Amino acid sequence: MNPSYKGKVRDIYDLGDKLILSSSDRISAFDVVFPQLVPDKGKVLNRISVSWFEFFKDVPNHILETDVKYFPIPFQNHPDLEGRSVLVKKCKRIDYECVVRGYISGSGWKEYKNDGTLAGIKLPSGFKESQKLPEPVFTPAVKNDQGHDENISEKEMENRIGKELFNILKEKSISIFLRASEVVDKAGIILCDTKFEFGILDGQVILIDELLTPDSSRYWSTDTYSVGISPPSLDKQILRNYLETTSWNKMPPAPNLPAELIQELREKYQKIEDLILSCTSQKSK
């Protein structure tokens, strides 16, 4: 069964007014897909995302069904989809990534070091790497399915889509981020940053894509967090770190990865799943 669209790590089946989103075991870094699979990665990401959508069920979203046996024929009980897929409403995608940062890290830290800004917003001097921001900062990006997303300022996004829609996206993104941060904190996890995606269906803004997975978010453990360094992430950062030690030029084809690294990645994904599901199993407030 061939998907209608095959992304770096996700397969999409177009059913007309609905879509099936299937999370594969493929892994990518620097926008390049690697030849090996990480066993069960797709199922882990799917379970995490579904658990968050259920937790935030008060926020309108695109989910229709999470159990393959209730998918339309001929997709019912299909082994390639089992446990890693969701049936969703097709909507008009808003082509922006709504990134929220609670800490100054990654590309945000690089920008601040160079320019004293974060997404074009001037920040006070004296911030250190991985320091918590006084309040979450909204740093949008234009989606680019063929390559790197383009970071833009709040003002530029507002000018492109209008003040009303911009305010809705910003407010929803920061609200979900704050609620999720409070929830995972109870399990000793820090939500450093994440990205949300939204669509429009019947005139309503709804939450789409994946939600608060370790592929769309940066999670840290409170046990290893420290200001002034880049703390170990509970995600595929170990893959990026490994690649930085090689001579690979970050262009296709991707190199083969050591078996022990694949196993370590698998364990990382399973660990963050256990931690997150222990939080999201409680009823959304």
Curated annotation (Swiss-Prot):
* Key word NAD present: no
Q: Which family does it belong to?
A: Belongs to the SAICAR synthetase family.
Q: Which residues, by range, are in coiled-coil regions?
A: none
Q: Does the keyword Nucleotide-binding apply?
A: yes
Q: What class of enzyme is it?
A: ligase
Q: Which Pfam families match?
A: SAICAR_synt (PF01259)
Instruction: Name the EC number(s).
Output: 6.3.2.6
Alphabetic keyword roster: ATP-binding, Ligase, Nucleotide-binding, Purine biosynthesis
Q: Name one GO cellular component term.
A: cytoplasm
| Database matches in InterPro entries | SAICAR_synt/ADE2_N, SAICAR_synth, SAICAR_synthetase_CS
What this protein catalyses is: 5-amino-1-(5-phospho-D-ribosyl)imidazole-4-carboxylate + L-aspartate + ATP = (2S)-2-[5-amino-1-(5-phospho-beta-D-ribosyl)imidazole-4-carboxamido]succinate + ADP + phosphate + 2 H(+)
Gene Ontology biological-process entries: 'de novo' IMP biosynthetic process
Q: What is this protein called?
A: Phosphoribosylaminoimidazole-succinocarboxamide synthase
GO function term, MF aspect, one: phosphoribosylaminoimidazolesuccinocarboxamide synthase activity
- Known CDD domains for this protein? SAICAR_synt_Sc (cd01414)
Q: Describe which pathway this protein belongs to, using the record's wording.
A: Purine metabolism; IMP biosynthesis via de novo pathway; 5-amino-1-(5-phospho-D-ribosyl)imidazole-4-carboxamide from 5-amino-1-(5-phospho-D-ribosyl)imidazole-4-carboxylate: step 1/2
